[in-house]
């Protein structure tokens, strides 16, 4: 990617993690040079060790929304909860109490069906878990561990660096989980 000062190109990577809700351990990682997250959901799920059980449900933010991700997760027997767009903040009471309405028709678009699914009580509860599962892990890696950029060049070396960062996070987390309170 060309930088803004016309001084050459910057390499940018897109790092992904799959985090277990109850343990908040990183279960799988992936790294790509894709400009957005859409093509990274399925490779990250596929990176999950076969000895671990696959998740039954997966909550993803709107950067992952695509028909191919929905179909791919369903084909892996994973129920997707993927935001279809930005969620409005500070909604009025009228909007919050608005009725759910009728379910979309069978021939409705994937976006309409997913938007309805996320408006159900089960959908809201499941999507809400994403905020307290994945986001704190990323925040700890960036703020507490101070990892904000890759120091090695090339995607293979950067991927190794990302795995080491995630292993370091998991060691810190395991220490918290097994330490007596």
Where in this protein do the model-derived segments appear?
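Anion-binding and metal-coordination hotspots
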Residues: 1-181
